[in-house]
Amino acid sequence: MAAAPPSYCFVAFPPRAKDGLVVFGKNSARPRDEVQEVVYFSAADHEPESKVECTYISIDQVPRTYAIMISRPAWLWGAEMGANEHGVCIANEAINTREPAAEIEALLGMDLVRLGLERGETAKEALDVIVSLLEEHGQGGNYFEDANSCHSFQSAYLIVDRDEAWVLETIGKYWAAEKVTEGVRCICSQLSLTTKMDAEHPELRSYAQSQGWWTGEGEFNFSEVFSPVEDHLDCGAGKDSLEKQEESITVQTMMNTLRDKASGVCIDSEFFLTTASGVSVLPQNRSSPCIHYFTGTPDPSRSIFKPFIFVDDVKLVPKTQSPCFGDDDPAKKEPRFQEKPDRRHELYKAHEWARAIIESDQEQGRKLRSTMLELEKQGLEAMEEILTSSEPLDPAEVGDLFYDCVDTEIKFFK
């Protein structure tokens, strides 16, 4: 398999983002044939001393986990991106650093995304959860469903709530983080922190010295110290794609950015594809609900972003969930990944038809894509009404919001 291209995630704060909204977006660049599912897990109480089984290892469970909505490769436990009931959003990026990532199975970066969402009521709390679990359990194991070789990475995270974001970058159990409260920030699959660090592992600098990567003299620049000597990734055009927007950034701007293939933000190559995308809108006014949009299908330029709002009685959406193989899943048996089961969910299968038409028939494909975008626009307009309304949100009206959007999309494709 060729080297993985960069994934991108972005956050924009007011006043760069419009109407007092924090806007968050993420593209997940993964192997072309990998299916991502979108799954809701309700808040739950857990027995004392119970365990939670992550992708490769089990760890201690906490007494209570928050409700989450996540987009994840269907073979693993964690998440590429997601949100929780408190308006915390997290996405991660696989990164290469001077220190090779561990192939020994531990927590995956994606596991830490989900654990942060389940356990963190604010962005800072989620950050603290992730770094403490990193210290305790480490990170490692195969990031891809591939029996032939182990693709292991270090991880970077963008952790966002209504008030602030944290950029967290990790090297093994060592880490540094920067707090962001204004402007636009992008992380992609390389280190980005330099000399501004608002929190760090207590032994980070002494570790860098022990490896001969820093003399201990002069200013400590995280990226310079820990980036690989030969870093061929160029994230420049992608990073600039949102920052160079002259107008205020809206949810539509973020979606357009994630659909941009020319800048490299949207990946469509021989081995890799943007397999799922997500956008979240977090109003700084707490009387307005956070709204989270997920595609659940590959290639955002040929997909529909569908809205979801956390309420007490969410209608589950089995049509975006992959089949469950239980203990027979090749990802759970050792040696792992000896087979690749069909993980396509109902929405994914319906969407394959649309992708084929858009790729093969110019006229019909253009009309189909135009109709898809019109469907999406109707959803965006309905959400805009909710955000600008002075009336309190009626939970009964939005509990089946994502379900209805998925159902409409599948019927449309059929």
From Swiss-Prot:
It holds the Pfam family Peptidase_C69. The modification N-acetylalanine is found at residue 2. It is found in: Cytoplasm. Its main location: cytoplasm. One of its GO terms (cellular component) is presynapse. Keywords: Acetylation, Cytoplasm, Exocytosis. One of its GO terms (biological process) is proteolysis. The active site is at 9. GO terms for molecular function: cysteine-type exopeptidase activity; dipeptidase activity. Signal peptide: none annotated. It comes from the Eukaryota. Belongs to the peptidase C69 family. Secernin subfamily. Regulates exocytosis in mast cells. Increases both the extent of secretion and the sensitivity of mast cells to stimulation with calcium. 'Secern' is an archaic English term meaning 'secrete'. This is Secernin-1. It comes from Homo sapiens. The lineage of its organism: Eukaryota, Metazoa, Chordata, Craniata, Vertebrata. The gene is SCRN1.
